């Protein structure tokens, strides 16, 4: 196999504009593309400023319902600061900061209930 990375994954949402605004304005992702491909399909692609993996905000996969995706893991250099900033922006954390041997993390949901883990790791291997 010559697979080198995960490039993109789809996040099921109910309102693409609301979700784009959340990922862009609250989480600081950059919009890489926003195009209407067909009358039923709009392609919105975003990524963290220093990330290699991007997301698409999708409404057209009937087997992917908004809120079904859990475990979107994003890395931060400043967990405490980002938890404070996100809380001030109206994000409700579903867990407090959890300390582990490999690092620290806190969890919250996007506007549709897709689960996001905000973490700061001290070790690439998480176990």
Annotate the PLM regions:
Residues 43, 73, 105-107:
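Short hydrophobic/aromatic beta-strand element in the GNAT-like acyltransferase core
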Residues 49-54, 63-64, 79-81:
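Short, charged/polar surface micro-motifs in flexible loops or helix N-caps
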Residues 11-52:
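Core segments of cupin and vicinal oxygen chelate
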Residues 10, 30-38, 98, 119-126:
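Conserved catalytic-core motifs of GNAT/GCN5-like acyltransferases
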Residues 101-103:
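Short, small/polar residue-rich loop motifs at catalytic or cofactor-binding pockets
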Residues 1-20, 69-72, 122-127:
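N-terminal beta-strand motif that seeds the catalytic metal site of vicinal oxygen chelate
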């Amino acid at each position: 196999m010559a697979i080198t990375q995960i490039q993109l994954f789809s996040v099921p949402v109910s309102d693409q504009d609301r979700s784009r605004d959340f990922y862009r304005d609250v989480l600081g992702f950059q919009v890489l593309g926003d195009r209407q491909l067909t009358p039923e399909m709009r392609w919105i692609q975003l990524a963290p400023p220093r990330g290699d993996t991007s997301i698409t905000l999708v409404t057209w996969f009937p087997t992917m319902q908004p809120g079904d995706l859990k475990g979107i893991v994003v890395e931060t250099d400043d967990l405490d600061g980002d938890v404070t900033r996100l809380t001030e922006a109206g994000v409700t954390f579903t867990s407090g900061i959890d300390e582990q041997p490999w690092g620290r993390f806190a969890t919250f949901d996007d506007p549709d209930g897709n689960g996001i883990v905000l973490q700061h790791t001290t070790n690439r291997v998480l176990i």
